[in-house]
Amino acid sequence: MTPSQKQYLVIDLKSFYASVECVERGLDPMKAKLVVADLTRTEKTICLAVSPALRALGVPGRCRVFEIPKNLTYEVAPPRMALYVERSADVYSVYLKYIAPEDIHVYSIDEAFIDVTPYLSLYGCTARELGEKIRADVAKTTGIPATCGLGPNLYLAKIALDITAKHSPNFFGELDEESYKLKLWNHKPLTDFWHIGAGIQKRLAAMNIHTMGQLAMAPTEPLYKEFGVDAEILIDHAWGIEPTTIADIKSYKSQSHSVSTAQVFDHNRDTEGARLIFKEMVEALTLELVTQKLVCSSIGIYIGYSATEVQMEELRQTGDYRSWRRHIPSSSGTKKLSYPTNSRDELMAEVLSFFDERVIPSESVHRVGLTFGNTREETGPGIQTSLFQDNTVLEKERQRQDTINAIKKKFGKNSLLKAMDLLPEATARQRNAQIGGHRSGEETNEA
C-alpha cells in the first residue's frame, strides 16, 4: 500500500438472522442446520436466512420453504426482527470501539463499509490485521461469525467480500487493481459482480461481453449507446476503479424523496379486500408524512395479482420462481397531485380514486404497494397549496393527526385503531407488530 492509498474494509455478518437464532439457542452458527422463515404464511414464503451448514449442502440463501430438499433435517426459527435490530446495534457498538462514526457506512443491517486508512498508524498494524481484530471482537462479543473484504476502494473491497472471501478458507478476501484483473477478469457469471443483475448481464451478452476482461477491452461507444451514463460505472468497475468514498456517501443528499409501503398477502384478496388495505396504508403513510413534517406531490400504486392454477402447476414443475413471476399480471401507475399535501382526507380520496381506476376487478390480489413521492418539507421554499383549501379544516385535521401520533408513540401503534382495522381482511394490527414486513418477535406485547 502506498502512503496515499486508501484501504477499505467490508464486514458481512454471515447468514445474520440465522446466526442470531443459533446463538440464542446455544448452537454453533457454522454447524447448525437452521432457517429463518415464517411458516404461518404460505409454502411460498421466503426463507429470510439459511445457516452456512445448510448452504454448504446446496440450499440457496434466499430460497422458498418448498424449495428446500425434503430429505434434509433442519430447524425453523420464526423471524424476530426486533432482536436482529438489537444485535446489529451490538455489532455496530463493536465497530465504534475501533473506528469513528464518520468512517463507517452502514450498508445494510448485516453489512458495513469501513475506511480503515486513518487507523493503521494509530494501531500500528496492517489493514488485514485490523480487520481480523474487529471481526474477532464481533465474534467474541455477539457470537456471530463474519466475512471480510479488503481493497483500495469501495468496489474492490465489496468484490473481495462477495467473490474472493467466499472461496477463501478463512472467509477474508483481499484485492487490489492488479490482483482483480489477474483473478477475476475471466470470472463468470457477471452477475456475481456488484451492481450487475440479470438484465445488465443479458444486454452485455448481446454485445458478446461475458467477462469483466471483455468489458474492459470493449469499444466504449457501443456501451454508452446501450447504457448511457451508466456505461461509465460499468467501465470503471471492469478496471477495478471506484472514485466514490465514504465521505462522498455521507455528504450526498438525494434531490428526490418518497415514503412507501408494500405488502404480500398470506391469502389473496378480492377487490374490496385490497381496497381496504390501501385505506390502511394511506392512514399509515399520512401519519409518517405528518410526523416528519413533509408533504408529497405525487402518488404511486402497485397491484400484483395471484397466479392461476395452470401457472402454479408450472411453478411446481420448474421451481423457477423468478422467471415465472414475470408472467403474473399486475397494475401500476403514478399520478401527479395538483398541489403538495399531507392531508389524510385529500390523499385518501386521491389514492382510492386511482385504485378504482387501475384495479382489475376480476383478478384476485396477492400484493400491493403505495408510494407518496416527491416529498419535501411542508414549510420549505416553493411550496404552494391550493387556493381552495380550507386552512381551518386542515389545521383541525393536523391537530387530530398529531394527537394520534402522540398516543401511538407513547402506548404503541395498536393502542389506537380505526373500526376498519378490526375487519377480518385488515392487516394493520398485524403489521403494526412487524419490522420491515416481518415478525418482530414481540407480537404479544402489542398485537
Where in this protein do the model-derived segments appear?
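Short Gly/Ser/Thr- and Asp/Glu-enriched loop/turn motifs at secondary-structure junctions
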Residues: 107-111, 151-154, 294-298, 363-367
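Catalytic palm subdomain of template-directed nucleic-acid polymerases
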Residues: 114-135, 208
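Short acidic, glycine/serine/threonine-rich loops at helix termini
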Residues: 20-23, 46-50, 156-164, 228, ...
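Acidic, metal-coordinating catalytic segment for phosphate/diphosphate chemistry
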Residues: 20, 326-447
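Long, highly charged, low-complexity intrinsically disordered interaction regions
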Residues: 129-188
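DNA-contacting surface of Y-family translesion DNA polymerases
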Residues: 3, 10, 202-365
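Residues that scaffold, gate, or flank divalent-cation-dependent active/transport sites
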Residues: 1-109, 113, 238
